[in-house]
A protein has these predicted regions:
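Active-site hotspot residues in diverse enzymes, especially metal/ion-binding acidic/histidine motifs
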Residues: 1-210
Length: 210
């Protein structure tokens, strides 16, 4: 297997699926993905148990096609996981079962699913166009840049995913934005506390015993 060619083909597939289902921006929601799942005949099984290293799995057997998702995942990880499993639907159905955990995360099939998901949620071409429009030159992308980009596009690609993309495309030096921790804190510094988070904190404060 030519890995680079395989990954490039998956990016092309991601673009085709986006176009087929009318996705034209960097914001791909769970609702969008559920709609695609429904058209593809994929059932969703929300698993109530917590897994330390497993977010989802794809099953294709005599009962049909099912994607198991860890219930309660936040919006960004849920969207990425659903897009990840969608790659297995298109390319790996003959395997019967596809899942990603620490034992196989470096295998081409799973890396390919990550490549597909990142391109599906925020295509490289759109990422480049947005950064160019923001006046960000090669090697000059900072954590602040990515916070502004996420705010502008409302993408469901996580900060970690955006950081990987920024370094791979040359907008940030290697091991700079991917090494950054504290995305939510930086987001709050730049844009203020999310009102829902503020309300939740206020409620918790009122509920504390004297």
């Amino acid at each position: 297997m030519n890995r680079n060619g395989y990954y490039d083909d998956l990016k092309i597939l991601a673009a085709q699926v986006r176009a087929e289902h009318g996705l034209h921006s960097a914001r791909v929601t769970r609702t969008d993905l559920r709609r695609i799942y429904s058209k593809c005949g994929i059932q969703i099984d929300l698993w109530p148990y917590k897994f330390k290293n497993l977010r989802g799995a794809f099953f294709c057997d005599e009962l049909g096609m099912t994607v198991m998702l860890a219930k309660g995942l936040p919006e960004d990880p849920m969207a990425f996981t659903m897009a990840h499993e969608l790659k297995h639907y298109f390319k790996d159905r003959e395997l019967g079962l596809s899942y990603c955990d620490l034992s196989n995360e470096d295998k081409p099939l799973e890396v390919g699913a990550e490549v597909f998901a990142a391109e599906f949620l925020f295509p490289d071409a759109d990422f480049i166009a947005h950064l160019n429009a923001m006046g960000v030159s090669v090697g000059r992308c900072s954590p602040e840049t990515l916070v502004h980009l996420k705010r502008e596009t409302r993408t469901t690609l996580s900060y970690a995913g955006m950081a990987i993309k920024a370094e791979r495309l040359g907008f940030a030096p290697r091991d700079t934005v991917t090494a950054f921790k504290g995305w939510k804190k930086l987001e709050e510094q730049l844009y203020g506390v999310n009102p829902w988070k503020a309300r939740a904190a206020s409620r918790r404060g009122r509920q504390r015993p004297n």
